[in-house]
């Protein structure tokens, strides 16, 4: 079962190259994760109030745990909402 390619050339298409994202909290002048820094924490909360996963934000696993703990602490203290309607 051989399939002939239309157009002849036989060249394969290169796959889409996706650049690997780096963690925004690693590096020399990276911001510190603090539960009082509401403006920073809001960047990692969805419009429904959920914590955005690290595969989307490119945060490392260690920093994602710190980030989620800071968001939960800020929610408990009333600095961030639990749910956004």
Swiss-Prot record:
Keywords: Ribonucleoprotein, Ribosomal protein, RNA-binding, rRNA-binding
Feature: compositional bias, Gly residues: 1-12
InterPro entries (UniProt xref): Ribosomal_bS18 (IPR001648), Ribosomal_bS18_CS (IPR018275), Ribosomal_bS18_sf (IPR036870)
Domain of life (superkingdom): Bacteria
GO BP terms in the entry: translation
Gene3D superfamilies in UniProt: Ribosomal protein S18 (4.10.640.10)
Keyword RNA-binding tagged: yes
GO cellular component: cytosolic small ribosomal subunit
Region of interest called Disordered, as start-end residue ranges on this chain: 1-22
GO terms of molecular function: small ribosomal subunit rRNA binding; structural constituent of ribosome
Purpose: Binds as a heterodimer with protein bS6 to the central domain of the 16S rRNA, where it helps stabilize the platform of the 30S subunit.
Assembly and interaction partners: Part of the 30S ribosomal subunit. Forms a tight heterodimer with protein bS6.
Similarity section: Belongs to the bacterial ribosomal protein bS18 family.
Protein name in the entry: Small ribosomal subunit protein bS18
Protein species of origin: Azorhizobium caulinodans (strain ATCC 43989 / DSM 5975 / JCM 20966 / LMG 6465 / NBRC 14845 / NCIMB 13405 / ORS 571)
